[in-house]
Amino acid sequence: MKAVLQRVAEARVVVAGETVGQIGQGLLVLVCAERGDAEGQADKLLAKILKLRIFSDEAGKMNRSVQDLDGAGKQGGLLIVSQFTLAADVSGGNRPSFTDAAAPDEGRRLYDYFVAQALALHPMVQTGQFAADMQVHLVNDGPVTIPLHIDPAA
């Protein structure tokens, strides 16, 4: 399973002119299920995202997670957006291949599982819409952008 995290001051997802998900300070999480992924990969990826210390402390060091933005328990938002294009393979030419992405039904199942687990573990979760044409608006903070990958064999 793959994800790209972007530390944001704010972010929102628009579908057909309507905002479907919106957060203030937190993480925009672009997520992709790959062939061979299962719930175990989703669990490991979510655990890493929630614990990753990429928010600054008082000294300006990346020392805080989305679960503790201010050192006093303030939590940031998670905006979770499905993006199968993270599985793109461009090694064979100039047109990306997406054969490494999970099949659409399996991708939706794992995305829904990932979101459900996030909702169970974190109080501030918003989402995009699976397989929709979305416009993602964000104010990248830093910028800080972190790619994550949990191997299907893990």
Curated annotation (Swiss-Prot):
It is found in: Cytoplasm. GO terms for cellular component: cytoplasm. Keywords: Cytoplasm, Hydrolase, RNA-binding, tRNA-binding. Pfam families: Tyr_Deacylase (PF02580). A motif (Gly-cisPro motif, important for rejection of L-amino acids) lies at residues 142-143. InterPro entries: Daa-tRNA_deacyls_DTD (IPR003732), DTD-like_sf (IPR023509). Its main location: cytoplasm. One of its GO terms (biological process) is D-amino acid catabolic process. It catalyses: glycyl-tRNA(Ala) + H2O = tRNA(Ala) + glycine + H(+); a D-aminoacyl-tRNA + H2O = a tRNA + a D-alpha-amino acid + H(+). Coiled coil: none annotated. Its EC number is 3.1.1.96. One of its GO terms (molecular function) is Ser(Gly)-tRNA(Ala) hydrolase activity. The keyword Acetylation does not apply. It is an enzyme of class 3 (hydrolase). It comes from the Bacteria. Belongs to the DTD family. An aminoacyl-tRNA editing enzyme that deacylates mischarged D-aminoacyl-tRNAs. Also deacylates mischarged glycyl-tRNA(Ala), protecting cells against glycine mischarging by AlaRS. Acts via tRNA-based rather than protein-based catalysis; rejects L-amino acids rather than detecting D-amino acids in the active site. By recycling D-aminoacyl-tRNA to D-amino acids and free tRNA molecules, this enzyme counteracts the toxicity associated with the formation of D-aminoacyl-tRNA entities in vivo and helps enforce protein L-homochirality. Homodimer. A Gly-cisPro motif from one monomer fits into the active site of the other monomer to allow specific chiral rejection of L-amino acids. This is D-aminoacyl-tRNA deacylase. It comes from Polaromonas sp. (strain JS666 / ATCC BAA-500).
